[in-house]
Amino acid sequence: MRKLASALLKPGTLGRWFVAGVYHHPLRFPVALCRSVVATKKLTGHIFPLRVRLGIGQTLRVSVGCKSRVTLTGNLLVNSWGGSNIPSSISCADESSLAIAGDFEIGPNVHIEVVRGANLTLGGKRHSSASGITCNSRIMVENSVAIGADCIIAWDVYISDSNWHEITGMTRCAPVSIGDHVWISHGVSVLKGAVIPSGCVVGAKSLVTKSFSTERSLLAGIPAKEIRSGMEWSR
């Protein structure tokens, strides 16, 4: 029994989430549980394992199109930040693909849109204490966006691989790649063709528009440039 209790209450497990919810919010937790079941069903097509877990008062709007592929080997955690309960959303159009490899957390007013035939990969948590998007941010995918493990995305961040409109003489879209253990600060925009290597930090309000190759570097500016190398950071 002791081993079972220890396993159930291990950080990040369904048991710990359930027990904490019932203990701290006995009246409101059933609503969060029902919303989590519905969101899991919409995203994955089944309700067990319960991969989507909503915090108290949080709402996740889910739309999954025909023949789309959603793979959650980790858990999608929807929590509050700064007391906000603005709904977040995930939209996967027909024949699109969304894969979340490890636990990934999103806050309020986070919107993820994957259009027809596009692919989005989120590495989630692997070694760090958490990985995810704080709040008020948007990811829009027309072709391919890959975000590695143990990444932190702050608030007011925009990530997209497309212009979303045709501009004469310019490529409409190009894949975006973000490595492992990357910290994207407040107000950053990551646009088509951007490559951010593992271990990098992107300074606040920066605009990333091209491919970088040096890991563990500080990228900052409009457009972003390599400011410093040999960066070390942690949560």
Residue ranges and their predicted role:
Residues 1-158, 179-181, 198, 214-215, ...:
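Domain-scale signature associated with acetyltransferase and cell-envelope carbohydrate enzymes
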Residues 136, 140-141, 188-201, 206-211:
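Beta-rich strand-turn-strand
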Residues 154, 185, 203:
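ABC-type ATPase nucleotide-binding domain
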Residues 170-179:
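Glycine-rich NAD(P)-binding loop of Rossmann-like domains
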